[in-house]
From Swiss-Prot:
This is Thymidylate kinase. The gene is tmk. The keyword Nucleotide-binding applies. Its EC number is 2.7.4.9. It comes from Francisella tularensis subsp. novicida (strain U112). One of its GO terms (biological process) is dTDP biosynthetic process.
Length: 209
């Protein structure tokens, strides 16, 4: 079976970590090898860039274009050093976020032109597209309430409600325009989200469990 690149997307507080735990449980049950990673981050250098983007400790504003480029510098490291090699070896890759998050957060939220982001993906990631995107949709108010229960808000989580409304709108547009993305209502119970994820994976891997 050809290796798969599966990405979980969604706003902060949508439950991506929980969703990934369900994906892990499913793949392990079916004896499918996989690595589990995240963005921003995924490699040592990418994690350093993540920390700078989310927890800027300097008395200097990060321009929206700079934010995008720092995230993409980390993404290139992540893709070249972890994602692509694993897929080439026949190992499935499951990632908490990929380039859709830049389209939504930096494009929708910050207002960076989407064409710039697509160009980065085409030029530096060989136009890499996930085999499956599971998008967890949630109202930004509920998502931020959930995120605040986990810990102190990071730099992006402090961006405000309108920022997250714009981000959500781009996510939903991406799902509509994609042939390999499925939206799940993340406001539903954990049990219902788990059930839907298993059904999606059954169909994707042609399994009947």
């Amino acid at each position: 079976m050809q290796s798969k690149f599966i990405v979980i997307e969604g706003l902060d507080g949508a439950g991506k970590s929980t969703a990934i735990s369900f994906v892990r449980k499913y793949l392990e049950k079916n004896n499918l090898a996989a690595i589990y990673t995240r963005e921003p981050g995924g490699t040592k250098i990418a994690e350093e860039l993540r920390n700078l983007v989310l927890h800027n400790k300097y008395d200097e504003e990060i321009h929206s274009d700079s934010e995008l480029l720092m995230i993409y510098a980390g993404r290139v490291q992540h893709y070249r050093n972890l994602i692509a090699p694993a897929l080439e070896k026949g190992i499935n890759v499951v990632s908490d976020r990929f380039y859709w998050s830049s389209m939504a957060y930096q494009g929708g939220g910050r207002g960076v032109e989407l064409s710039k982001i697509r160009a980065l993906n085409d030029n530096f990631l060989n136009g890499c597209e996930p085999d499956l995107v599971i998008y967890l949709d949630i109202d930004p108010i509920l998502g931020l309430q959930r995120a605040q229960k986990v810990g102190s808000p990071d730099r992006i989580e402090k961006a405000g409600l309108e920022f997250f409304n714009r981000t959500r709108n781009v996510f939903k547009d991406l799902v509509k325009d994609s042939d390999n993305a499925i939206e799940i209502d993340a406001a539903k119970s954990i049990q219902e989200v788990e059930k839907q994820i298993y059904l999606i994976l059954d169909k994707h891997f042609n399994f009947q469990n």
